[in-house]
A protein has these predicted regions:
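Conserved "HGTGT" condensation-loop signature of ketosynthase/thiolase-family condensing enzymes
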Residues: 1-124, 144-148, 174-199, 205-207
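Short, high-confidence coil segments that cap the C-terminus of an alpha-helix
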Residues: 150-154
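Short conserved active-site loop signatures built around small residues
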Residues: 135
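Acidic/serine-rich, low-complexity amphipathic helices located in mid- to C-terminal regulatory regions
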Residues: 159-161
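Short-chain dehydrogenase/reductase
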Residues: 139
C-alpha cells in the first residue's frame, strides 16, 4: 500500500482569481511575489524551495527514518527553468547560459542533488521535467519506484518559478486550465473533486 505521510505547500490554500488576463481564471500563487512574476520576471527557484524545505520538514524526515531505500524526485517542468520565457527579452537565465556555457535545464539536476543531500537521500535522485504539470506526472514515478524497484519511501518536491501572463494565456487558450466562466460546469480535476478543474500552480508541493 502506498500512502502519503506529510505534505507542505508554498502557496495559499485558497486560489486567487486573476481577471485582468484574456482568459480569467483562478490560480495558486505566492501573493507577495506574483506582481513581478506576472510581468514575466523569473522568481529564483531556490527562494521557492526554501519556502517548503524548512527545518521542520528536515527534522520530520530525520526523526522518522524508514528501513530500506529512499528516493528523491524534483518535479520542475516550467519552461522558465530553460531560459525560454517569451514575456521579456533580457532573461537572466538565458544570460547565465551564455556566460557560463551551462544549459539552464541542467540546474534542475543540481538543485535536486543539493536538496536530496539535505534529506540524506542517496539511493535515487532524479528530476522530472516532462511537462508543466510535472508534479502530477511524478505521482506515477513514485508508484513505479515503490512497486517495481523496491523503494520504501520517495520524497517529492514540485516547484515552478512563477505564474505569469504567458502561462495563464497558454493554459487558458488550450483549455488545460479551468476558466472562471466554466467553474460552475464542475469539470473533473486532475488533483481533486473540489475545484472542478485544474488550477495553475496546483501541482507545486512537497510530499
Amino acid at each position: 500500500m502506498i500512502y502519503m505521510t506529510r505534505c507542505e505547500t508554498a502557496y495559499t490554500e485558497t486560489p486567487t482569481l486573476i481577471d485582468d488576463v484574456p482568459y480569467p481564471q483562478h490560480a495558486h500563487i505566492i501573493p507577495e511575489t506574483f506582481k513581478n512574476a506576472k510581468r514575466g520576471m523569473a522568481y529564483p527557484p531556490h527562494k521557492l524551495i526554501d519556502r517548503v524545505v524548512t527545518e521542520d520538514v528536515l527534522a520530520y524526515v530525520e526523526n522518522n527514518p524508514v528501513e530500506g531505500k529512499t528516493g528523491f524526485i524534483f518535479a520542475a517542468g516550467n519552461q522558465g527553468w530553460m531560459g525560454n520565457n517569451g514575456r521579456y527579452d533580457k532573461n537572466p537565465e538565458a544570460e547565465l547560459h551564455y556566460k557560463v556555457k551551462l544549459p539552464f535545464i541542467v540546474l534542475t539536476n543540481i538543485y535536486a542533488g543539493r536538496i536530496a543531500s539535505m534529506f540524506g537521500v542517496h539511493d535515487h535522485v532524479s528530476t522530472d521535467a516532462s511537462a508543466c504539470a510535472s508534479s502530477l506526472k511524478v505521482l506515477m514515478d513514485v508508484q513505479n519506484l515503490i512497486n517495481n524497484f523496491g523503494f520504501d519511501r520517495v520524497i517529492v518536491l514540485g516547484a515552478e518559478d512563477g505564474v505569469n501572463n504567458l502561462i495563464l494565456e497558454f493554459f487558458g487558450e488550450s483549455g488545460a486550465s479551468l476558466q472562471y466562466k466554466d467553474e460552475d460546469k464542475r469539470q473533473p480535476s486532475a488533483f481533486d473533486d473540489i475545484n472542478g478543474g485544474f488550477f495553475i500552480g496546483q501541482g507545486a508541493v512537497l510530499a
